[in-house]
């Protein structure tokens, strides 16, 4: 009986950890999602990837973690699952809540290194509040895929 009880507690603890992980994605999750997007794009093309993002495909949108896409030369947003009103716009010089032009930093990092992390403040779609965010960026040909997580 003691083993059954202990086993049940372990299962509950594991399940609770899994639920928590799903609610709060990690840097590893962001990297994996961006890389999954890059692999899909290489296999199916940019247009198909844009359709997946726009359709909020569960491979590329999971709660507050999602992939968006921007043109590496112009900075124009090509696809965004949470805020489609910014698609087609160049927001490169629009700062975050603290005045940081993080989108310019994203483009420069993508052009120079091809991948990396950028920190800034952004509205969390889950909480509705401006929160610290870090985004993994990955260059794929002429676009930048971005997948970010909110810091706690």
Predicted feature locations:
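N-terminal membrane-sensor/transducer module of prokaryotic signaling receptors
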Residues: 2-152
